[in-house]
């Protein structure tokens, strides 16, 4: 009880910081608990939709290798009914931030998961500059040697990356939990090297510019009980992508996710990712999988393989599996929870060989962690993992999957 008495004020204080850390690479829109009090039931008809609300606040988040991100957010949203699968019918979100090392970003998002019957829309426009982006080479056998990083070559595994672009995705409900999604995406990317020797400079020279216009169509089967803190159900998708980057490329992929409650407050979750590319994709296209309403960084980091640095491995094809158990150690009901995590991640990439289902060359790692859930609005995860590269600590906003 003493531990609970110490943690409860911290959770209540965190409510004041509601939404200050984005939920993963492309955050879902969330609303605080108080937003739901505005729903009005009238004798003349069914419950009315709540009014649109505005919130704005500064926050501190993480930027891989760039240090803390100091940012400001404006969030304009329409809260959903409390019992709904999502927390907002629709939301506009604008963020701007900088890092002490010179990184900066501006993003504008619009998400409407249930503003229109049987339709969902998401869109994003962004300009992001990362000054310590990690580059470790292409392929499954790349080596990361921390001893090789010295004062004479401090940026051996680092490169600057600037990305400008946007996307729009429209999803239509076909029948029951089956949906079809169409994504359009455009991006310009520029890599520039930092002072001294680097693996990137040895591979591509001092600068690499890329542009890419792509389209993706996917079928999605979604039976989750809710989208912000899933306890049971399936989220299955399969799709194909065509892109203009490089000399043109294609991609086939599938992402299969399942969630099973083991007991009150305990959930087992699993994910299988398989993707294969043809043609000549850009370097940046190898770094991400355009999954439904979100990207999956490939391969490494808190949203793919937690025992490795973000995008530790890159290749034309990828095979990834994740299993984890989430147990609410300190549940506070609607206020949130402190959750323990145990996970196992395994995966590999393919570059000079065809994709295949295999255990050869698969990188296996695992560990545990702690997650803090604040109301229905934010989930922060702290992961402690071990694998082929040794110990790795990562922080995520939202569940890994």
Regions found by a protein language model. Name each.
Residues 128, 138-145, 197-203, 255, ...:
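Flexible, surface-exposed loop regions and adjacent strand-edge segments
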Residues 58-60, 72-76, 108-112, 166-172, ...:
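Residues on the lipid-exposed face of transmembrane beta-strands in outer-membrane beta-barrel proteins
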Residues 97, 101-166, 270-314, 380, ...:
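Outer-membrane beta-barrel translocator/channel fold
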Residues 93-95, 151-156, 200-206, 239-244, ...:
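Extracellular loop and loop/strand-boundary signature of outer-membrane beta-barrel proteins
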Residues 20-123, 127, 179-183, 191-198, ...:
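Outer-membrane beta-barrel initiation region
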Residues 106-112, 152-188, 226-234, 246-248, ...:
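Outer-membrane beta-barrel transmembrane strands
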Residues 208, 215-335:
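C-terminal outer-membrane beta-barrel translocator/porin domains of Gram-negative envelope proteins
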Residues 58-62, 72, 92-98, 121-131, ...:
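Transmembrane beta-barrel strands of outer-membrane/channel proteins
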